[in-house]
Amino acid sequence: MATARALLELLRWHRPSGRLILLVPAGWALWLNPQAPPAAPLLGWIVLGGLAVSGAGCIANDLWDRRIDPLVERTRNRPLASGRVGLLTAVILLLACLLLALLVVLALPAPGRGLCLALAVATLPPVLLYPSAKRWFAFPQLVLAFCWGFAVLIPWAAASGSLAGGWPLVLVWFASLAWTFGFDTVYAMSDREDDRRLGVRSSALSLGAVAPAVVAICYGLAAAALAAAAWLQGLGGLGFWLCWAIAAAGMLREALQLGRLDLPRSAYGIHFSRQVQLGALLLGLILARRG
């Protein structure tokens, strides 16, 4: 019988950074929305929905990869790969997460509920199929980035009742895509040797030696797009932009460090955690100005 610890690991809820990296773009959307700051109940529903959807995505990933994960050093101890959770239990938990996500959407404010439901339904195919992309697409991280884009669209629709957000919405959405492609490419860099051996595709393999530079460009574009969205919404001030520049420089520095030849495998996980912190710092700067 699966233990509570194994189920938490299957959902990835035992690692806060993995959940925050989805909730940070949702926060960007909520606090750069014209209706900001969001009401406390809406914020709670968005957090709960984000946990449910990310949990469902992680389970779907492990179901797709249950025969590959035992062959990869980083993933061989995952609950399904190690046999600590059975297939039926994983499927039931996946359905429970999807049901919880549906209930969250139905609890959202009425003006945007129908649109959020449509967006949630549109999210399902890419979220559930993303794990298969590494089998047929050279840049599966683009699929994940597209999935992450809904973490901006759904909160924005829930807060404002529509997607008529103009350039601020477009910029926040683009920032989420660029940031996600960057950090997930780094995540894939730790598995390059195993992926090459197993015939699995990734942007880290496809980009080769230029991967660190591309990641740096993605982070730079994300920081610039968010800055433009903040400026369009009237945020600013010397202290704000100085802190923003420091955070953006930190993101770029972390990316450029990836070009070192002596990096241990653990460095990629550390990079992932630091990106969560830097993305949250950008959100914190927005929060400080929006209240």
Residue ranges and their predicted role:
Residues 1-7, 58, 62-85, 184-209, ...:
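Cytosolic, membrane-interface loops and tails of multi-pass inner-membrane proteins
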Residues 5, 228-291:
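Extended hydrophobic alpha-helices typical of membrane-associated regions
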Residues 8-9, 48, 56, 75-171, ...:
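Intramembrane alpha-helical segments
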Residues 20-29, 79, 143-159, 206-209, ...:
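Small-residue-rich segments of transmembrane alpha-helices in multi-pass membrane proteins
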Residues 26-27, 50, 98, 124-127, ...:
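Residue-level recognition of pore/gate-forming positions within transmembrane alpha-helices
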Residues 28-48, 102-118, 153-174, 224-240, ...:
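Helix-coil boundary and interhelical linker segments in multi-pass alpha-helical membrane proteins
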Residues 48, 66-120, 197-244, 277, ...:
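Multi-pass membrane catalytic core of lipid/isoprenoid biosynthesis enzymes
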Residues 50-61, 127-130, 175-180, 187, ...:
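Alpha-helical transmembrane segments of multi-pass membrane proteins
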